[in-house]
Amino acid sequence: MLQSAALLVLAAASNVVSARWCRDLTIPVSLTSRNAVFDIEPLKTEIDVTNFYLELGRQGGNLADKLVKGYKTVSGIYTLAATYCVPDKGPGDVLQIMTHGVGFDRSYWDPPIDDYKYSYVARAVDDHGYSTLTWDRLGVGKSSHGETINEIQIFLEIAALAELTRKFVNCTVFEHSYKRVVHLGHSFGSAMTYGLVNQYPDISNGIVLTGFSQIPAYMGLFALGGNFVPVSSVPSLASQYAEGYVAAGSKSAVHTNFFGPDDFDPAVLDWLYEHGQANTPGEILTVGATGGVANVFHGPSLVITGERDVPFCGGDCYATSAIQNKTSNLIAASEEFFPNASPFNATVIPKAGHGLNLGYSADLAFDTILEFLEAHV
């Protein structure tokens, strides 16, 4: 049952798919965060965007440090678009909250492709009895949008994820309360999740970071491989986002950044290019703000990334020269940043690219995640 119409606006109807009941939600939240102030104008032209990413990908450079001139408090009332799913028999014992990465919206976790073959939500709910909550990150999709440099940054988005979690734990959305909540992230969503549990270590009972590592050396490959352009240059997005947003400018860019060679169906690439979303320069400038420091989180922690991940492995997670060959793969190097995690696991998925859920190897990734959560949460 719903508790408060003032706090929740329901979509017109629930969606019944297989053995689950799903409902689209629009959830108002009051947020405050300490954001960076960057000395850069909104990116309006293709030259603006290209120059930005050339500076971002510059070897030995740190564009965020170069541009930051201080910090300020950002506050406001926003709305978050989400989808809540439970098994037909009723809510599961554990709620999984999932946060997507750059270029996606919440459909990343439940894409309607090939009879939901690539849906992590379907596996988690239908086959394993979990409840799930997917959401469009603040600034993306059907959630509130905002100013693209100094408002929509990782700090405000972490505040949104924390508030969303509290609303479900405290029964202010549905009367059912969850005593155990786990957080899953992909890419930027993993960086958010990492920051969330470092800031609020008791907010989660376990985390899964997909498409993630603690190696920043390869972000320039993603920045330049994405062929980013102003959102006005992307017909499918131009009417949905304001000036200042950016998005991938070609299907080959999406292929480069998200798919491993021979590990994907071309129809999935087509779907992703047609349904891809925009992002803000403010997000890109702050994505590294939560990493590089030891995390205080003490719960079960899984880092799982594709072998051919471009931004976090440079296209080969087993090439370890960037860390002086200290571990057998780049994902295992994350362990030192989780000194309190119990347990910690690092897994590399063979052949998979950065878009872990969308490759032929997705089944192995899903099995690994669900086995970890069932064993430890």
Label every model-predicted segment.
Residues P339-V377:
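Catalytic active-site module of serine/aspartate enzymes centered on a nucleophile-bearing elbow/loop
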Residues A19-P91:
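N-terminal cap/lid segment of alpha/beta-hydrolase-fold proteins
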Residues M1-A19:
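Fungal secretory targeting signals
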Residues V173-S187:
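Alpha/beta-hydrolase fold nucleophile elbow
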Residues K89-L133:
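Short, surface-exposed "cap/lid" segments of acyl-processing enzymes
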